[in-house]
Amino acid sequence: MDEIYPAVGNELTMEVWQQQWQTFEQEGLDTLEKRRQQALALDIECQAEQILGSPGKIICQRAKQDNSDIIVVGHRGRWGLSEILLGSVGNYVFHHAHCCVFVVPTPD
């Protein structure tokens, strides 16, 4: 395969894609910082970081690495067939974590 075929009809340039990714990344960091500040206001010791990858796997790996006693994870209310088809971070963590998992329903 020595041939290269240009993609036509796609207005998404690398520059636009990078800008969109940076915006997405910054929104995630802003949300994390907001939640971290809320926890600190309640005297809850916490840290926040944004890691690229599968959330459930990363949470389980990080908890094991940090020798955590418990993982607290939110659940947005997908149950039954919807959860099976779409997946759930809380469900993955519940079934794969090395420690106790507390799944908290989050308000809509």
Curated annotation (Swiss-Prot):
S-S bonds: none
UniProt cross-references to Pfam families, sorted A to Z: Usp (PF00582)
Top-rank taxon, per record: Bacteria
Residue stretches in coiled coil: none
InterPro entries (UniProt xref): Rossmann-like_a/b/a_fold, Universal_stress_UspA, UspA
Protein family according to the UniProt entry: Belongs to the universal stress protein A family.
Record protein name field: Universal stress protein Slr1101
Native organism: Synechocystis sp. (strain ATCC 27184 / PCC 6803 / Kazusa)
Lineage: Bacteria, Bacillati, Cyanobacteriota, Cyanophyceae, Synechococcales
